[in-house]
Amino acid sequence: MTENRTITEVVAALIWENDRFLICQRPAHKARGLLWEFVGGKVDPGESKQQALIRECREELAVEVSVGDVFMEVLHEYPDLLVRLTLFNSAIVSGELQMLEHNDIRWIKVEQIPDFAFCPADVDILKKLMEGKK
């Protein structure tokens, strides 16, 4: 029943390095713990989606990113919240990846997607990636 629920705006980064893209494993103690996802998080009040993504990448991975165009937007209903996830094409412009929040981080090829258990909100995005739509 989505009609009476507040939508939580969430942003994430699709970061490529040659033919691999970055995924992050959620900490065990958080909701959807140990599932894989794209780096990102909630948009704070007064922030643009792009500002939120830059902040989240800094907080979670200690890197600065440039935010490009929207790769895809999905609306997903979890039992505990309704999210609108906006995934941006992004690139690391400075800093070295550090795991400041996640359990693990990996660079994977598209054909490796089935080897990882992802957050349900990412499923349609992953399908688009597997169809070869960069």
Feature annotation, model-predicted:
Residues 49-57, 70, 88, 105, ...:
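Hydrophobic packing within well-folded, soluble alpha/beta domains
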Residues 89, 98-129:
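NUDIX/MutT-family hydrolases
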Residues 60-67:
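Short secondary-structure junctions
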Residues 64, 72-96, 106, 129:
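Active-site-adjacent beta-strand/loop module that shapes the phosphate/pyrophosphate-binding cleft
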Residues 2-22, 42:
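Conserved N-terminal beta-strand and adjoining loop/helix that marks the start
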Residues 15-16, 23, 90-92, 107:
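Conserved hydrophobic "DFG−1" position in protein kinase catalytic cores
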Residues 20-59:
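Conserved Nudix-box catalytic region and its N-terminal flanking loop in Nudix hydrolases
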